[in-house]
């Protein structure tokens, strides 16, 4: 397995729409494994392939405290949403920013697992929030897109300054 480079906002590659995975083969399984390792090392609880410069519909999530419950979602699609819930979110591609975002409280998602098997998951709370956040990445959307224009401008300036300092 390998640690992958995580793209940081305002990198325009984060705005690309991910393409569906045609077949769950060795390369997709390796990508998922590398993404999990990268996410754990970061550390984070979710990562979309777009964030590691691979525009494919692959997401990894693990909200467990001990990294024991990895979830791989390939070609995920939310098929039902219910209620509203607000929770604080952060993002590995937008470091040091944590803000409340309102999303569906409960969701049902269809996806292929790491073995290419069709799955359905009904979930709520943190896992529902995390899935919605990561699926936004597959559409080229970031959690900061839910913020006001002024707040997004401040975050962009901060991100650009951080890039200059790290270059």
Curated annotation (Swiss-Prot):
Single GO molecular function: metal ion binding
Disulfide bonds: none
InterPro entries hit by this protein: Peptide_deformylase, Peptide_deformylase_sf
EC number(s) on file: 3.5.1.88
Enzyme category, top tier: hydrolase
One BP term from GO: translation
Catalytic activity, as annotated: N-terminal N-formyl-L-methionyl-[peptide] + H2O = N-terminal L-methionyl-[peptide] + formate
Keyword Metal-binding: yes
Protein's name in the database: Peptide deformylase
Keyword field: Hydrolase, Iron, Metal-binding, Protein biosynthesis
Protein family per UniProt: Belongs to the polypeptide deformylase family.
Function of the molecule: Removes the formyl group from the N-terminal Met of newly synthesized proteins. Requires at least a dipeptide for an efficient rate of reaction. N-terminal L-methionine is a prerequisite for activity but the enzyme has broad specificity at other positions.
Residue positions binding Fe cation: 91, 133, 137
Active site, per annotation: 134
Cofactor(s) essential for the protein: Fe(2+)
Gene3D superfamilies, per database record: Peptide deformylase
UniProt keyword Iron, yes or no: yes
Cofactor comment: Binds 1 Fe(2+) ion.
